[in-house]
């Protein structure tokens, strides 16, 4: 592990610009670059960090010749110093070449790639800020299957360890540094647990759960935690005050990106170049009514699977749709590929009603947010009325669309995506087979067959509190 020397007697400041879960929102980069430039004018030694999930969510980035190269080029131009690995960094097998183009470091302590994986990752890095030693440790979330939330084929040859267990190994590293930062892609609640367990951390720059924090966020066991919503609505300017080798002051300022009055002209030119693909402008349908929420778009995807796959039931994981809303008007390939950027294939499975319920129960992990969405059946769920977020599931039942009892012994033709197939195939009887069509193509075909669509709302889910 790298070693840092304790430095200095008088108070000095380290300034950091932090992002998380940018999800390829390259349109925000002209203002992000201007924010970075304005801070760098005042603080020439400014550090710029990302907490991961830089890619996935914009076809101009995700479908570029080298997938996600636009984000890397723009991050280089802004002057990023390092990024954590997010689970979506593994969505497409373009990470090794991207690392060769990156002018910043990839930091992750709980990943152990084989030599064949071709990944150039460091567990920690020490940044020299005018003689102050700022140590950074990186971590990525690991699910119950022992990997980040991505298709298992994307992480072959890579072993992961639980973040909490790994961070414990770096306490001595922190003692040698003037400031210690955890660049974390594990989620807000897990960041709080990290702070409670490891008070020697000075700062956690968080991501993964898209939690919008504010200047009023209290310190957690003395540790400052920051995070923003996804797609760059805000960035965080962090000031660490250091005296005698210890952090004696911590402050976070959240800056609104969209309303920032200045744009970088150079970055605007780069964004225009990356976005100039006529394919994205092709119209595939018309939305007669708006789709106001991601859940309404989840059910549009479910309907596409149901009808195009000629299925009895369709299942879509809640994270399978990446667009938050859709306005009235033309629906373009840009919209389709923003909704479904994952290159998943449509998969057919033959499952009993009991197995379908098991998928919903197991995958949801007791959370309404994580509950997969279905079409062809109505999912009746009860949430705990005492839960502040109304997310804790108490029960899940399925009914037929006309309100009859769902036959759990009957075998149904189910169409889902290859990510869901990989997540559930270990506890169902039929591993399924590919329909040899990408889910984005299936969605496109469905929209083109309808021509005009209307939002049907939440017709396949009923939520009650108890």
What does each model-found stretch correspond to?
Residues 4-259, 265, 296-304, 348, ...:
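Acidic, metal/ion-coordinating pockets
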Residues 9-13, 19, 41, 169, ...:
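Catalytic centers of hydrolytic enzymes
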């Amino acid at each position: 592990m790298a070693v840092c020397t304790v430095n200095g007697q008088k108070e000095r400041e380290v300034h950091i610009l932090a992002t998380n879960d940018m999800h390829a929102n390259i349109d925000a980069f002209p203002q992000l670059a201007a924010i970075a430039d304005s801070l760098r004018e005042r603080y020439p030694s400014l550090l710029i960090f990302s907490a991961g999930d830089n890619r996935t969510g914009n076809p101009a980035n995700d479908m570029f010749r080298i997938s996600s190269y636009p984000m890397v080029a723009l991050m280089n131009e802004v002057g990023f110093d390092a990024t954590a690995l997010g689970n979506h960094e593994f969505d497409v097998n373009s990470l090794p070449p991207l690392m060769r183009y990156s002018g910043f470091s990839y930091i992750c302590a709980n990943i152990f790639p084989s030599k064949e994986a071709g990944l150039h990752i460091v567990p920690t890095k020490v940044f020299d800020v005018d003689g102050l030693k700022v140590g950074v440790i990186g971590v990525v979330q690991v699910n119950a299957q022992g990997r980040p939330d991505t298709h298992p084929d994307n992480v072959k040859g890579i072993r992961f360890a639980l973040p909490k267990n790994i961070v414990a190994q770096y306490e001595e590293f922190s003692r040698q540094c003037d400031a210690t930062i955890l660049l974390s892609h594990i989620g807000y609640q897990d960041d709080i647990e990290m702070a409670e367990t490891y008070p020697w951390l000075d700062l956690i720059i968080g991501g993964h759960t898209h939690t919008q924090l504010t200047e009023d966020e209290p310190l957690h066991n003395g540790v400052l935690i920051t995070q923003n919503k996804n797609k760059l609505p805000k960035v965080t300017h962090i000031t660490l005050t250091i005296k005698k080798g210890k952090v004696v002051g911590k402050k976070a300022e959240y800056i609104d990106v969209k309303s920032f009055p200045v744009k970088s002209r150079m970055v605007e030119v780069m964004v225009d170049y990356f976005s100039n693909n006529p394919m994205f402008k092709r119209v595939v349908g018309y939305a007669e009514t708006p789709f106001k929420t991601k859940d309404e778009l989840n059910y549009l995807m479910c309907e596409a699977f149901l009808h195009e796959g000629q299925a009895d039931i369709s299942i879509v994981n809640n994270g399978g749709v990446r667009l938050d809303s859709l306005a009235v008007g033309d629906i373009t390939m840009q919209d389709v590929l923003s909704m479904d950027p994952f290159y998943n294939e449509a998969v057919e499975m033959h499952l009993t009603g009991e197995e379908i319920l098991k998928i919903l129960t197991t995958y949801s992990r007791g959370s309404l947010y994580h509950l997969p969405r279905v079409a062809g059946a109505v999912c009746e769920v009860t949430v705990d009325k005492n839960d502040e977020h109304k997310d804790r599931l108490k029960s899940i039942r399925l009914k037929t669309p006309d309100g009859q009892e769902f036959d759990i012994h009957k075998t149904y033709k189910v169409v889902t995506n290859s990510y869901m197939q990989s997540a559930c195939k270990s506890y169902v009887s039929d591993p399924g087979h590919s329909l040899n069509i990408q889910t984005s193509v299936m969605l496109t075909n469905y929209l083109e067959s309808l021509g005009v669509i209307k939002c049907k709302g939440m017709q396949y889910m009923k939520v009650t509190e108890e």
